[in-house]
């Protein structure tokens, strides 16, 4: 089963997660936004103030001079009547399509290193404008007092002055989502036979015939939780080894409420957010483990167990990718919704475990009822 777990994990990785590792940042201008913000952190730290904004404008002016010098001495563009970046922008925004210009432009943008400055000049004004209007970009919701209060907090605490690209944030969210799905499915797959195997071999009747045998129910639950922690830890270690190759550690101290990212109910850094998602994965994994083992203890066949597991996994995976991980603390979802769902799942699971444990102690082996 371990081999099948590894094979399944590799398939899920190749189908979903590998793209976020092999193609990050994904294309242009994502690559240029990433590089610009990495340089911004190197120059200004994880937050940028008004003085540093003026310096960024100087960086833009220098890039503009570099582009003008490039165009003034470039025969390919000179033949098209382009001698400055202004000429280039005018031609580029023209409604009339000039195929020779398009071919030359994309040749430099995609194939020549001289085209890098053109990508940077495209994105730098957007970054500067975003930052300048950072306090005016939020919508006003008069009917949602808590939302307005949180937005005011973000502005007052200057959380939105942080440098964190949404490209970087979404990349991590996608990775933790896909690995989370992989962990959930893997745990369910590995723990389904915990009780079924004994019933299939008629060993459960022998267990009920002894006092010690009845205690095996709790022992198996504990063993299942330990297995879950091992599976989750191994998969997370693999995730962060792979994620390390994306080179995003410079953003770890950035506030997640950056003007270049979304808004959240909490004032935390990117690394703290990562830590909370890891805790969430462990909680979700343990809940999945208990549900899978309880279903295994009630079902008589693998087919019946799988049928029951499909619904539970659908619910758990659905909640994981929509609220419990990918939308954790995001402001457009009620503030305590994720916490309430986590708490509800934990309480329900604990109650079921307690009830099932009590039933196991008094189960009559002659009148045992199974699904």
List the model feature ranges, each with a label.
Residues 198, 240-253, 298-302, 306, ...:
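Membrane-interface elements of multi-pass transporters and channels
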Residues 50-155:
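Long, solvent-exposed extracytoplasmic domains/loops
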Residues 7-56, 123-198, 218-298, 333-342:
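Secretory targeting signals
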């Amino acid at each position: 089963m371990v081999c099948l777990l590894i094979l399944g994990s590799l398939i899920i990785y190749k189908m979903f997660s590998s793209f976020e590792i092999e193609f990050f940042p994904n294309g242009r201008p994502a690559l240029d936004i990433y590089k610009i913000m990495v340089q911004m952190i190197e120059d200004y730290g994880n937050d940028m103030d008004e003085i540093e904004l003026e310096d960024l404008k100087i960086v833009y002016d220098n890039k503009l001079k570099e582009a003008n010098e490039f165009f003034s001495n470039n025969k390919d563009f000179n033949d098209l009547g382009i001698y400055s970046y202004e000429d280039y922008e005018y031609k580029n925004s023209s409604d009339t399509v000039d195929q020779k210009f398009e071919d030359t432009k994309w040749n430099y943008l995609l194939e020549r290193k001289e085209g890098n400055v053109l990508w940077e000049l495209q994105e730098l004004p957007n970054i500067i404008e975003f930052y300048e209007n950072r306090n005016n970009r939020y919508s006003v919701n008069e009917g949602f007092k808590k939302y307005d209060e949180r937005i005011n907090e973000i502005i007052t605490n200057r959380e939105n002055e942080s440098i964190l690209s949404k490209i970087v944030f979404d990349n991590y969210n996608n990775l933790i989502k896909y690995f989370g799905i992989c962990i959930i499915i893997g745990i369910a797959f590995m723990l389904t036979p915990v009780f079924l195997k004994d019933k299939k071999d008629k060993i459960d009747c022998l267990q009920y015939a002894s006092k010690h045998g009845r205690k095996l129910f709790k022992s198996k639950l504990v063993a299942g939780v330990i297995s879950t922690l091992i599976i989750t830890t191994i998969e997370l270690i693999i995730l962060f080894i792979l994620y390390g190759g994306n080179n995003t550690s410079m953003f770890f101290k950035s506030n997640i409420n950056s003007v270049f990212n979304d808004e959240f109910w909490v004032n935390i850094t990117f690394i703290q957010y990562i830590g909370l998602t890891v805790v969430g994965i462990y909680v979700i994994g343990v809940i999945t483990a208990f549900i899978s083992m309880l279903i295994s203890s009630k079902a008589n066949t693998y087919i019946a167990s799988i049928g029951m597991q499909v619904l539970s996994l659908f619910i758990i995976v659905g909640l994981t990718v929509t609220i419990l991980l990918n939308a954790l603390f995001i402001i457009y979802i009620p503030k305590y919704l994720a916490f309430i769902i986590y708490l509800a799942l934990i309480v329900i699971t604990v109650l079921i475990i307690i009830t099932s444990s009590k039933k196991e102690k008094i189960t009559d082996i002659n009148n045992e009822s199974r699904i």
